[in-house]
């Protein structure tokens, strides 16, 4: 539960139609399994105690009394499981029969949530048996509870007393499929997790529709959504039920059970992440909570005592063992088809952004420094796409290679080959003499290879590009990527500056993927030479090449040895900015995700380095050139990330 992780389960138990005794044993068995797995919330299907397909038997007193007696036994069996549980059954009160979710924990029935919308169309004819629940919540006598009563109504939220933001509400099957689901109101009243007890029959194509519905609702509500539906064991007189269970979090499917086989899926929902998203989205209004009853519940042994960074003892929530995983490259889709599609989208967005800027300024030429590295290669690809969109010749792309002390043969020749294969104009301007003259002018020893030595080269290159832009009447296109901007690994008013930065919201790991995608595309189009040079650029170690090469003509200046592995930095960047993760949580999930690649000590080292750089280098980001947003994370000071340049980062370094 520490860091907001709550382990939840969606269960499809084995059942028999109208056999409450068998179903009781099956439900209790699955409850105990979920508890053993550490689940703190378990959701069972609609009408689980009796089965959904009882038909006219729902009107029989014999079945209703058996269902109620079974519920009481199941609630007794929940003692000691320390788990909030949702189970469906038919329940009669005030002369009407309701389809309800019984919500209980450790022997106490906390409430009953009746189904709001009763379907009576196609294969569904629930209105023949059940009444919809409208009106306000009310109290029901329930002598088994210590209070002697329980709550009844569909405006109930079950709120944990110890765990901030853990507020759970329920809806039942059809409630989700209507124009305005009850869960909309639940979320607006503060619920962060929705339990849906369902009995959704299978027909051709319904699986995808159901998946999209659950996934979309969790995204719309910025909520966790636990969807448990009935499966094998229901009557097959007219229908088949597949047990298609889903657990989603803010539009992301965390767990999905294969259909046509009963069983349980368990994962963790991150309620802190959901709370962060709701804080950020000011259109996510909290309203209507006055009409809700908030029912407290608590868990046993949720706290432990640990020493903090200052050596003082403090009470903290226990750490939940995690079953869920986190993508190592969060900026890149894991599925190849989706990866290829998104790569095309990103390059198109970049190109369209530049197209508008060139059309607005009336410029016909684009000036770009071409180093033979990843960033400038991607920029060149984007500029070519822009020129094609504008109907201009690619010869209007003025690619400038500016070798100096640290330029290697590999990057130099790759820049030349790339310009040739892209069909763009290449100019070579050696800046060694200019830099040496400048260093002499300021009295700097050329043998002192400090930051002045390095930055003088970067600023000289920018000056050359700016002057050429004047010469051609064109725009200098920035090549720096978002990872470099996050780390401040850019020379202020050097490569940091341009007239339009096409890579400003592209992290380094995504830059590599986009160039790799371009290589694959070139090969498909029969452009093997272009594909080969792009592939070699992808495989070239990242380096600014600002320090002199060794005797073999190779650079010993490796960027990732200075600032840390980009896969780690991009992982940190995404989870910090996108989800607002606190440092110890980010460290924890990084250790889990990269356990096979880095030691905990290495991860801690680079995480602290990331935070130090991120805060210290904001002043560079505060004056960034314009550039298009392409993903959910960007550091534009005019857009998504407005941070003061003099903010203190001590809290993130403790």
Where are these regions (language model features)?
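Enzyme catalytic cores with a strong preference for nitrogen-chemistry domains
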Residues: 1-367, 385-394, 426
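ATP/NTP-dependent adenylation/nucleotidyl-transfer catalytic domains that generate, transfer
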Residues: 23, 164, 223, 235, ...
């Amino acid at each position: 539960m520490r860091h907001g992780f709550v382990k939840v389960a969606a269960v499809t138990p084995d059942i028999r139609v109208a056999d409450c005794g068998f179903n009781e044993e099956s439900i209790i068995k699955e409850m105990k399994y979920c508890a053993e797995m550490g689940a703190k919330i378990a959701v069972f299907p609609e009408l689980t105690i009796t089965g959904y397909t009882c038909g006219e038997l729902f009107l029989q007193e014999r079945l209703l009394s058996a269902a109620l007696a079974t519920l009481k036994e199941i609630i007794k069996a929940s003692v000691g499981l320390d788990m909030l549980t949702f189970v469906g059954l038919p329940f009669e009160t005030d002369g009407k029969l309701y389809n309800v979710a019984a919500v209980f924990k450790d022997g106490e029935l906390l409430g009953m949530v009746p189904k709001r919308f009763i379907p009576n169309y196609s294969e569904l004819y629930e209105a023949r048996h059940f009444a919809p629940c409208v009106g306000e919540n009310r109290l029901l006598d329930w002598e088994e509870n210590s209070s002697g009563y329980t709550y009844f109504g569909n405006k109930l939220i079950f709120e944990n007393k110890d765990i901030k933001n853990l507020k759970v509400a329920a809806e039942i099957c059809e409630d989700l499929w209507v124009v305005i689901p009850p869960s909309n109101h639940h979320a607006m009243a503060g619920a962060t997790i929705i339990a849906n007890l369902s009995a959704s029959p299978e027909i051709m194509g319904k699986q995808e529709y159901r998946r999209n519905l659950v996934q979309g609702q969790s995204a719309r509500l910025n909520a966790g959504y636990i969807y448990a539906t009935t499966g094998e064991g229901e009557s097959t007189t007219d229908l088949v039920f597949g047990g298609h269970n889903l657990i989603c979090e803010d539009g992301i499917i965390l767990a999905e059970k294969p259909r046509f086989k009963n069983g349980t899926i368990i994962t963790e929902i991150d309620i802190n992440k959901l709370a962060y998203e709701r804080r950020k989205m000011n259109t996510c209004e909290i309203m209507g909570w006055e009409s809700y009853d908030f029912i407290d519940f608590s868990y046993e042994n949720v706290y432990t005592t640990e020493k903090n960074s200052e050596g003082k003892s403090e009470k903290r929530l226990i750490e939940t063992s995690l079953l869920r995983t986190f993508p190592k490259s969060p900026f890149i889709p894991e599925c190849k088809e989706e990866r290829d599609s998104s790569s095309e989208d990103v390059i198109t967005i970049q190109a369209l952004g530049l197209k508008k800027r060139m059309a607005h300024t009336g410029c016909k030429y684009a000036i770009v420094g071409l180093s033979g590295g990843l960033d400038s290669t991607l920029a060149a690809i984007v500029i070519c796409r822009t020129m094609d969109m504008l109907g201009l010749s690619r010869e209007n792309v003025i690619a400038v290679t500016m070798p100096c002390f640290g330029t290697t043969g590999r990057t130099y020749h790759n820049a030349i080959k790339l310009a040739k294969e892209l069909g763009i104009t290449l100019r070579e301007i050696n800046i060694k003499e200019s830099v040496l003259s400048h260093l002499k002018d300021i009295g700097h020893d050329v043998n002192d290879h400090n930051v002045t030595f390095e930055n003088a080269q970067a600023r000289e290159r920018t000056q050359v590009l700016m002057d050429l832009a004047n010469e051609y009447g064109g725009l200098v296109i920035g090549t720096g990527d978002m990872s470099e901007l996050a780390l401040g690994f850019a020379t202020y008013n050097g490569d940091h500056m341009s007239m339009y930065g096409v890579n400003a919201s592209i992290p380094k790991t995504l830059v590599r993927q986009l160039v790799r995608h371009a290589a694959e595309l070139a090969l498909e189009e029969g452009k093997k030479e272009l594909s080969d040079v792009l592939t070699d650029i992808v495989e070239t170690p990242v380096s600014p090449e600002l320090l002199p090469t060794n005797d073999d003509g190779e650079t010993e200046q490796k960027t990732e040895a200075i600032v840390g592995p980009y896969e780690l930095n991009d992982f940190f960047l995404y989870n910090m900015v996108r989800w607002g993760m606190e440092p110890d949580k980010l460290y924890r999930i990084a250790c889990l995700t990269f356990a096979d690649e880095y030691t905990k000590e290495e991860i801690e080292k680079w995480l602290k380095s990331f935070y130090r750089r991120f805060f210290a280098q904001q002043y560079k980001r505060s004056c960034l050139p314009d550039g298009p947003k392409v993903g959910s994370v960007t550091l534009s000071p005019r857009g998504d990330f407005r941070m003061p340049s003099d903010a203190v980062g001590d809290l993130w370094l403790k």
